[in-house]
Amino acid sequence: MAGSSEGNSVAYRIVLLSSISGAACIFFFSRLTIQISEYILGHPGIGLKQDSGLSLMSGGLGGLLLGFSDSFWRNCTEAEVYSLTGCFFAATLYFGWRYFVEGNTRYFLLSCFLIGAGLCVHPTQILVLPLIIGIHLFRQYPVLVKQIAKGILIWLILNLILGYWLTEGLVFVGLQMDLILAGHSGMGLPPGYGLLLVWLLSLFGFLIIFCLSNKKISHWLGLGLLHAGLAFYCLIPLRTDSPMQLGAGKDAGSFYAYFTRAEFGKPPGIYGPSYMQNTRPSVQSSWHWDAIRNHYARIKKKEKEVEDPQGWFPRMYSSAHAEAYNQWRLDQGYTIETPPTWKENLWFFLSEQSVHYFVRYLGWNFIGRTNDSPESQVLSVNSFEDFFSFGNKRRVNYHFLPLLLLILGIPSVFFFTQKVPLFWIIGFLITGPLLVWVLNMTPDQVRERDYVFQLCMVFCFLLAALSPISLCYGLNFRAKNTMRFLSALLFITPAIQLIEGWSSHDNSKNYSALNFSEILLASCPSQSVLITAGDNDTFPLWCTQQVYGFRPDVTILNLNLLHQPWYYRRLEMPGQIGQFQLKHPLPDSLDYKPILHVEGSAMERMDSLLRSKNWSAPLVWTRYEFILASILTDMEKFEPNRSVVFSPLLPTQKILYMRAETRLNGIGRVLNFNPDTALRIHPAKHFKSILAQSGRWNPENLNHIERSFHKLIRKKGLMHATAHENPDAIIRYLGWLDQSAPPDQLAGVIPQNLAYARLLDSCGQTKQMTEFLASLSLQAVERAKVSAFPEDYCREIEEIESMIRLQHPRFKFSESWFNQDPAYPCAGH
């Protein structure tokens, strides 16, 4: 549907595919609800006759509740894969339930094929595999139902083997075969044939066993059809021929990285590192096809390897999110001086990962949300303003009606039959709590992750859809007039969902992305080069240029994509919008290892900064500064008449050394090349300085400098001081940093400030420590004078004072600073 390359039709077809997939998901979910309702009503213990009207009511109610829910509705209006994922998931559940109840093998085989095909859309489709395996064991081996322990063990083993084979093992074996056939063996086959051979052997191997087997043939045929569903992956090499391609899987190496989602990494599960543990660099490698030399090349990638000891149940593991972990631990009353214990990790899993992510997403769909921002909270019944106010289009208020239906549907699922509870519990646990544990999500997610739990929403709305059965059973409703009244009463809930969610999901007049793109492109001089850094200031601009034909003369260069070979090929293609050719090509390995790496102590770099106080260049040279310097060098030498425009979303630190030479034009910062400008910013000089320092400075040490500049420098300095490298140099460096930093950068940094004070005290510099803490108290007092919440700063002052008195009981602050100051807001506190 989305295969056309004609401007507007591409976007239209992609959105249409998402909408049609959502409609198909609702259809299969409604059919699943009707089938389960008929099964429950046909049970002799319920005492209700098998009424088709009641089943249809449950199916219609379930489809409307799911369709108008916050997360599902949002997925249907976006050009993403999650709507199509939900379609495959609902269809697999429907045919799996039919097999569970009726025992018809064709439904099992169709479910296996849909699992394989759904994996090609999104890897979360693997979550339905344990449910189908459990249903198959229940049908084929009824004795395992009585031998519960043996049945659970066999179920777990099958899930581990098939789950690994489908998500990684198949492609890994294919990569090894590809290295033999297309690698250095001299056979000269194109890349990918080894992977294709392994897939064909797996497919036809199971089918041959099926033909030769005399009993239990559904096992082998199901495995064969599951592999046949994976054939949809053959579309990936075809669809990645577009000019703009990300993660093209054209060979076994890159396809293995795509298939295993290597860019997202693998978070630890049961046993792993803590975010506070020391790390040492390790070199890992991956295989990528070298089209020039016509063979596979091993690309080395420097990564972090955690030193022992490690811990159990690691939930706080990411060193990049240390500040968020520390803040959470302080809020919970824990100390941040030692690594988190397994009890702290368990509480973080329950309170943050389970409640803040998973339960909060459920609350958005069954209760409502305070606003439409990613930080939105669930509506609280204790807040009169949130719950009973009307007219706020950003607020979504379902008045607890979907939650009430969910609670009413619990008896229908658990009290009448045995198969329905088993079906629901396995599906909910795997797509909900177990997924929370496996993902091990870090704080401050880039975008909302509620789409990950979309599959769990299906089981939750299944409970709500079965609420009519509970009401009919509990209130003994049998009359037709009563049924009509009940249906009208129940369908008020999806109507409220529709009314409340319309303003949040109606994109008919939402042109914010187009308007932003036009404003930013209009801010660029003719034939200029626009430097961008993210998705939001790149893809909408490409769409505006290529689809709407607005300002095609501007060349858009994305720093995050310039290290991709396909992006270079696109920029150099004749007739392309924004054609650009880089005269200084970057190394092929730029995508897989840092350009600059420190081998020695970081003290040398800190001391040099301390002596020179030279901020003319970025503090850390990452590959992005490397790319930017090479672009500016090229333009200064070969295209001096073209202007460079920096996107407003580009982090300031990336252009710190040339910011004074830019001027604000519209919403972009324009850099015009002329003799004076070139003399001051010296792009070629900076480019050479990077090459000269290659192998000396590791950008991974400060990879989040853009987010928290001074806090991060302070934290890294304290880490080196703890290792007893050179505490005196750290003290001098941090002292210089405090003097050069703006006051607002140091406000309220209690953990870092107290750690700095302990560092001073450990070095025997008690006087400097007390002076530093006293100055912090004075800063807190000044902020408290003008703050609407002075008690927050009073607590900060008390914490500082208690820290000093803990180490120096006789120490007292000068009374002239506090008690004699009539403006002191904490007097007598």
What kind of feature is each model-predicted range?
Residues 34-42, 72, 77-79, 83-86, ...:
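ER/secretory pathway lumenal C-terminal domains and tails of membrane proteins involved
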Residues 5-32, 44-52, 56-60, 75, ...:
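Loop-to-helix entry region of an early transmembrane alpha helix in multi-pass inner-membrane enzymes
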Residues 59-67, 115, 119:
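Short helix- or helix-capping micro-motifs
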